[in-house]
Amino acid sequence: MTETPQRTRPLRVLAAMSGGVDSAVAAARAAEAGHDVTGVHLALSANPQSFRTGARGCCTIEDSRDARRAADVIGIPFYVWDLADRFREDVVEDFVAEYEAGRTPNPCLRCNEKIKFAALLDKALALGFDAVCTGHYAQVILREDGVRELHRASDMAKDQSYVLGVLDDRQLAHAMFPLGDTVTTKDEIRAEAERRGLAVAKKPDSHDICFIADGNTQGFLADRLGKAEGDIVDEAGNRLGTHEGAYGYTIGQRKGLRIGTPAPDGKPRYVLDISPVNNTVTVGPAEALDVDALRAIKPRWCGAAPTGPGTYTAQLRAHGGETEVRAELVDGTLEVTFSEPVRGVAPGQAIVLYDGTRVVGSATIASTTRATAGAA
């Protein structure tokens, strides 16, 4: 477990336990390291589907029971905290509003920013806890001058620093990631859970948006925003088909387009632009998705903000690769230029900047510039 100044003595640690294997092993490691650990499961959903057997996500009653059983095996106190109202306001309503505006949000990143390391952390500190522990794969590393840095996990294949890139210095000072500094496969984590007697050792990972129980994002949005039929057009404005709500699409999407005829060249079409004002979805060839620059707003820095232009690597989606960029903060907006064109960048997603393995900061993508023409 990576050390910080506060980690040199036993801490009172609140372990966020989702009911999955990663958070259970993280809590067990924190307890084994000598910390005074208390487990907590966050009740985040008022959706009745979350209470049915087999519901997917990480907010179900079964997950709460799994977390409690794991805490019992570890030998730590356990509580369930109801943060459903805060989660609905800060994550679910934001998710719907962003899609309605033609953007593609990342609810996991938003949850880390507003729930796990804000609502949960604030309550933990008020109750006298020193740190919040989660099962994320990332590292908080202490420099010689006492500054804490957020770094990628030792195992790049499982690194989750992207969804933690919104954390600021205060939040990092109270963050603990016991899984981040070990190079182990998921099978090894499961084997460790089994050795510890944790029943979640064989529990499948959840890859769905936790508050959409059936995994149907378009249906979830339609229930809240209603159907709004509009046109699907090509770049010349020719009508190719219709949709039931522009909010149901994202930049780069290929599947689910209701287009009756193929492109003249026979190649697939992709979503290039979403106009909530006109309720229009524009489609075109894959190469039209290439962008060479973007503007990003609401920057958050893990440490001091850069004082001038710099060269970094950037990650644009949770499971995406790295790309080299030139970035500069101009009047509070992050101006980014790619060394090579990047395909399918969606406004609303986060760009996270890295200096080696260190997270420099993040911002929300507001607009992009096509590699061949004007703004996307």
Curated annotation (Swiss-Prot):
GO molecular function: ATP binding; tRNA binding; tRNA-uridine 2-sulfurtransferase activity
Family matches, as Gene3D superfamilies: Adenine nucleotide alpha hydrolases-like domains, HUPs, Translation factors
Organism (species): Streptomyces coelicolor (strain ATCC BAA-471 / A3(2) / M145)
The protein, known as: tRNA-specific 2-thiouridylase MnmA
PANTHER family, per database record: MITOCHONDRIAL TRNA-SPECIFIC 2-THIOURIDYLASE 1, TRNA 5-METHYLAMINOMETHYL-2-THIOURIDYLATE -METHYLTRANSFERASE
Active-site residues (renumbered): C111, C210
Start and end residues of each stretch annotated as Interaction with tRNA: 158-160
One biological process term in Gene Ontology: tRNA wobble position uridine thiolation
